[in-house]
UniProtKB/Swiss-Prot annotation:
EC number(s) stated in the UniProt entry for this protein: 1.2.1.70
Domain notes: Possesses an unusual extended V-shaped dimeric structure with each monomer consisting of three distinct domains arranged along a curved 'spinal' alpha-helix. The N-terminal catalytic domain specifically recognizes the glutamate moiety of the substrate. The second domain is the NADPH-binding domain, and the third C-terminal domain is responsible for dimerization.
Gene Ontology biological process terms in this record: chlorophyll biosynthetic process; protoporphyrinogen IX biosynthetic process from glutamate
Organism expressing this protein natively: Rhodospirillum rubrum (strain ATCC 11170 / ATH 1.1.1 / DSM 467 / LMG 4362 / NCIMB 8255 / S1)
One Gene Ontology molecular-function label: glutamyl-tRNA reductase activity
Metabolic or biological pathway, per its Swiss-Prot or TrEMBL entry: Porphyrin-containing compound metabolism; protoporphyrin-IX biosynthesis; 5-aminolevulinate from L-glutamyl-tRNA(Glu): step 1/2; Porphyrin-containing compound metabolism; chlorophyll biosynthesis
Protein name (database record): Glutamyl-tRNA reductase
Site feature Important for activity, where: H99
Note: During catalysis, the active site Cys acts as a nucleophile attacking the alpha-carbonyl group of tRNA-bound glutamate with the formation of a thioester intermediate between enzyme and glutamate, and the concomitant release of tRNA(Glu). The thioester intermediate is finally reduced by direct hydride transfer from NADPH, to form the product GSA.
Binding partners and assembly: Homodimer.
Family matches, as NCBIfam families: hemA
């Protein structure tokens, strides 16, 4: 397990300004891996997302491997290694395994449980395969990471429930309208929170976005950034009937949308529902709008209450997911240890079989003699080795106890070896 090494930066350790200098696109990731391979690194994988830039490696001297990975990471900036002092992730061995498991399970993301990271990891894995830097150790790590990610998603609620105000708004819009591809969103005002919510709804699949504000130049600037059209604020009552979602954020506590305007709007819409987000602080929508049957009004406090429920659910799911990851790390360690023991077990089996055949050849017609020969030969080497081990140790008692523990485990001996031997001697003297 000591062969795994990882160096990198992420949102938990490194400021965004520094992370941004190290971001790699797919061709740059591939080129980095090719350079590492040319420098003798047999296994490597590089992951670059908005949250992290991390390079994983395996094989050879861990210190030398770490130095190579760090050199390539710093060359991206380029930045001096000293600039990363105290601001980077630097892991070895089983800690690397646990880290990768947490990444694929979305436990290391800025938004706990976000679903996109697994696809990003798989893309990085494909790039590493194409670059020729995925060996058996890396492949084993990645397959185990995908398996635990699947378990976490299926056995916990880590990805359920929105946790930000904008995500809550998007979820409510989907619940109300279903597929958002045919919906129209009207952004009334250009206050920052309103823009953020409108942008999230746009990312959720809203078909059309119209920006309308008292100051048209500001509306045009926001519309250009969001790829939206601009509506005439003077014709607001004509814009509203086409809007399935209205996000209001003009600031200053001004009343931008009243009950009477919405009553007329709903009548023209034949009471088709409208989702309204009041993003103003203080509010910009007349509270009585919520009395209208087809108007679904949420202010920021309403959205925050739903988001808090989502965060609480994810916190509980996070604890469950971390427990699953810990179990998976332990299982991975056991599996790797068992695989490492396979050659020795095969050699032991071959040795025993050779001794069995020799004993049979020397006493082909005498089972008693053959079995005595076999037992004697099988025990001779280990017995001599144990005597030499105890005699050559400065702490003979300690080595004897360790040897007894090993023998009990190897041969499932039921009691203390010393006591068993003493009992056998006593029984023999009585005979």
């Amino acid at each position: 397990m000591d062969g795994y090494v990882m160096v990198g930066v992420n949102h938990q350790t490194t400021p965004m300004a520094l992370r941004d200098r190290l971001v790699l696109d797919d061709p740059a990731l591939a080129a980095l891996l090719v350079r590492l391979r040319a420098r003798g690194v047999t296994e490597a994988l590089a992951l670059s997302t908005c949250d992290r830039v991390e390079i994983f490696g395996h094989g050879g001297d861990p210190r030398a491997l770490r130095a190579l990975l760090l050199a390539e990471l710093c060359a991206v900036g380029p930045i001096e290694p000293a600039a990363l002092a105290g601001q980077m992730v630097d892991l070895r061995g089983l800690a690397v395994v646990a880290h990768m498991f947490r990444i694929t399970s979305a436990l290391e993301s800025q938004v706990l449980g976000e679903p996109h990271i697994l696809g990003q990891v798989k893309a990085a894995h494909r790039i590493a395969r194409d670059a020729g830097t995925v060996g058996s150790a890396t492949e084993a790590l990645m397959q185990a990471a995908y398996a635990i990610a699947k378990r976490v998603r299926s056995e916990t609620r880590i990805s359920e429930g929105p946790v930000s105000l904008a995500a809550v708004a998007a979820q409510i819009a989907r619940d109300l309208h279903g597929d958002l591809g045919e919906t129209c969103l009207l952004l009334l005002g250009t206050q920052e929170m309103g823009e953020l919510i409108a942008e999230q709804l746009q990312m959720a699949g809203v078909g059309r976005l119209v920006v309308c504000a008292p100051r048209r130049p500001r509306a045009e600037a926001v519309a250009a950034r969001l790829g939206a059209s601009v509506g005439d604020h003077g014709a607001l009552l004509d814009l509203l009937p086409n809007a399935d979602i209205v996000v209001v954020g003009v600031g200053g506590g001004l009343l931008a949308l009243g009950e009477e305007a919405m009553r007329r709007t709903l009548k023209r819409r034949r009471n088709r529902p409208v989702f309204i987000v009041d993003a103003g602080v203080p509010g910009n929508v007349e509270p009585s709008v919520q009395r209208l049957e087809a108007a679904f009004l949420y202010d920021l406090a309403d959205l925050e209450a739903v988001a808090e429920e989502g965060r609480a659910a994810r916190d509980q799911a996070s604890r469950e997911a971390h427990a699953l990851v810990a179990d998976a790390v332990a299982a991975f360690e056991r599996h790797r240890a068992e695989r490492a023991a396979v050659p020795a077990i095969a050699a032991l089996r071959a040795h025993f079989e050779g001794e069995r055949l020799r004993a049979l050849a020397e006493a082909p017609d005498d089972a008693e003699k053959a079995t005595r020969l076999l037992v004697g030969r099988l025990l001779h080497g280990p017995s001599e080795a144990l005597r030499d081990l105890a005699a050559g140790s400065a702490d003979k008692e300690f080595m004897t106890v360790r040897a007894e523990m090993l023998l009990r485990r190897l041969f499932d001996l039921p009691t203390s070896i010393a006591e068993t031997g003493a009992t056998d001697r006593e029984d023999g003297s009585k005979g």
